[in-house]
Amino acid sequence: MAQLYYKYGTMNSGKTIEILKVAHNYEEQGKPVVIMTSALDTRDGFGIVSSRIGMRREAIPISNDMDIFTFIAQLEEKPYCVLIDESQFLSKQNVYDLARVVDELNVPVMAFGLKNDFQNNLFEGSKHLLLLADKIDEIKTICQYCSKKATMVLRTENGKPVYEGDQIQIGGNETYIPVCRKHYFNPDI
């Protein structure tokens, strides 16, 4: 029976590497997958899933008004799994579409993304995945400053911590840092 999986982690926790690994494992057995990512994430190009270690692959971009259920249902070849990167940027309707893919098409969906933003608020996609997912797993990484488990994301600009501003600002290592709670509130910058 298919399930909706939500795997979250801070920046640099290996979420995209995990997607690429899962896709490889399915495809190695001749089982097709669909990889999708938020259309908002254009760091490495539109419709590209890219890890910080240099692995990359094309993906179907998801806009907030995309009907993901119909897209998957109308594919000529039914996928064995749907893999979603940057799931924090999904709309509520996108997440409900993913649940329908699982429940009505019996296709497992694995969504990967951040849980909370730099102000420690849930992203819209994360909130609804936490509500609807059958299985929720944390992908762990360590705090950049002390090597404890990182649970938060610190936004920096010009080497200074930032706690206010727009929720969505596409960046990379240069603007977001995985940190523990202590170093979120008292960064060693």
UniProtKB/Swiss-Prot annotation:
ATP binds at residues 9-16, 85-88. Keywords: ATP-binding, Cytoplasm, DNA synthesis, Kinase, Metal-binding, Nucleotide-binding, Transferase, Zinc. The active site is at residue 86. One of its GO terms (molecular function) is thymidine kinase activity. It is found in: Cytoplasm. The keyword GTP-binding does not apply. InterPro entries: P-loop_NTPase, Thymidine_kinase, Thymidine_kinase_CS. One of its GO terms (biological process) is thymidine metabolic process. Its EC number is 2.7.1.21. It catalyses: thymidine + ATP = dTMP + ADP + H(+). Its main location: cytoplasm. Zn(2+) binds at residues 143, 146, 180, 183. Belongs to the thymidine kinase family. Homotetramer. This is Thymidine kinase.
